[in-house]
């Protein structure tokens, strides 16, 4: 990264450029030399929509935070090397910037500078990489390390931990929004004729002998011909999927060599869970999910999603700082009115989203 005449420049991701080209012209031959270094600048961009929006020749980034004093966009190359650039504008409490030559496949996250005062419900800490709540795709999972917590584990949550969490965090991924839906539409089966089949994306096909091993337990397995025939034999008109938006495996489960199997531990509401993809996590999961929906719809089968909008995977005040907590804790969560250090917990999950605010409902 370098700064020239007040403008900030950084190196674009080689993987992002390759994926964008593959989407346009098909698979590329192995490169015979390294990609040239590209220098691009950040422009003001626009505040809406939130998230990372690829616009053909670059990407607009926007994130909401009422309490932030400064927001850094963090871009990661194929080696995990991080480049930081300040989002230059703030409009309607959204920090935003447009970066030319950032393509689908680019990994990104944020660092939010602002007050760290847990006793007043403020938990900004720029040493903690925070993922975009509006990301459409993620690569990787949380690798549990003390650095992903906003406070030292040897102290209480009022103290601030300044270890960098980036090496242990998943990253958001810029996606290409284009997909050939071939005129797809919801079958709109009348309710009195609806037969719903509830299932789990992984468990339903993980051991299915008629599904290729490379597809078992994935989105594409849900629309494999053998599975489609099973739906029709049962008279199914709608498939209801247990949580498929991005979730994490809790620390205490991983310590016991277990997994968050059911998925009720959301961290990315706009992103299909990456571990259910068969071909990759740099946006491929989005296209596979869309292909599954399109195929089921073509067969007259509706798709219903089981969603988890009451809480997130960040838990209570002793949980990790992954996204919402480090971006704008009080805007996204319901805090105790008398002691905003603590979270209102209606369901025994550690926190409750503040669903009465426009921010959480957007």
PLM regions: where:
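The feature marks proteins involved in alpha-glucan
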Residues: 10-12, 19-55, 82, 90, ...
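Structural beta-strand segments of beta-rich domains
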Residues: 57-61
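Surface-exposed loop and edge beta-strand positions of immunoglobulin-like domains
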Residues: 62-64, 98-100
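Short proline/glycine-enriched turn/loop motifs at strand-loop junctions of beta-rich domains
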Residues: 65-70
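Beta-strand signatures of extracellular beta-sandwich domains
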Residues: 72-74
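Substrate-binding/active-site clefts of carbohydrate-active enzymes
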Residues: 165, 188, 200-362
């Amino acid at each position: 990264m370098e700064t020239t005449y007040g403008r900030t420049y950084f190196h674009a991701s080689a993987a992002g450029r390759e994926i964008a080209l593959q989407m346009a012209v098909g698979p590329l031959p192995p490169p015979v030399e390294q990609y040239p270094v590209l220098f691009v600048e950040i422009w003001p961009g626009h505040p809406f929509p939130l998230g990372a929006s690829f616009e053909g020749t670059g990407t607009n980034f926007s994130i909401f935070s009422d309490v932030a004093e400064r927001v850094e966009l963090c871009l990661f190359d194929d080696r995990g090397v991080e480049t930081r650039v300040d989002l230059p504008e703030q409009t309607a409490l959204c920090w935003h910037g447009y970066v030319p030559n950032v393509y689908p496949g680019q990994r990104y996250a944020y660092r939010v500078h602002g007050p760290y005062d847990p006793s007043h419900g403020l938990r900004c800490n720029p040493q903690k990489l925070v993922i975009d709540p509006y990301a459409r795709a993620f690569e990787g999972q949380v690798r549990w390390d003390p650095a992903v917590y906003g406070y030292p584990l040897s102290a209480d949550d009022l103290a601030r931990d300044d270890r960098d969490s980036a090496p242990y965090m998943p990253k958001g991924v810029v996606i290409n929004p284009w997909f050939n839906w071939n005129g797809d539409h919801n079958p709109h089966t009348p309710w009195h004729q609806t037969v719903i089949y509830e299932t789990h994306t992984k468990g339903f096909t993980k051991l299915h002998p008629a599904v290729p091993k490379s597809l078992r337990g994935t989105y594409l397995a849900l629309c494999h011909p053998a599975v489609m025939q099973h739906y029709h034999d049962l008279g199914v008109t709608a498939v209801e999927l247990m949580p498929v938006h991005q979730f994490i495996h809790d620390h205490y489960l991983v310590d016991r060599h277990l997994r968050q199997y059911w998925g009720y531990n959301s961290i990315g509401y706009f992103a299909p869970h990456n571990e259910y993809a068969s071909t990759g996590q740099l946006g491929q999961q989005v296209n596979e999910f869309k292909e599954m929906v399109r195929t089921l719809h073509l067969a007259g089968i509706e798709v219903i999603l089981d969603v988890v909008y009451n809480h997130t995977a960040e838990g209570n005040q002793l949980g990790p700082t992954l996204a919402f907590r480090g971006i704008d804790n009080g805007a996204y969560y319901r805090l105790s009115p008398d002691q905003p250090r603590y979270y209102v917990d209606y369901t025994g999950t550690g926190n409750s989203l503040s669903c009465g605010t426009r921010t959480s409902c957007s």
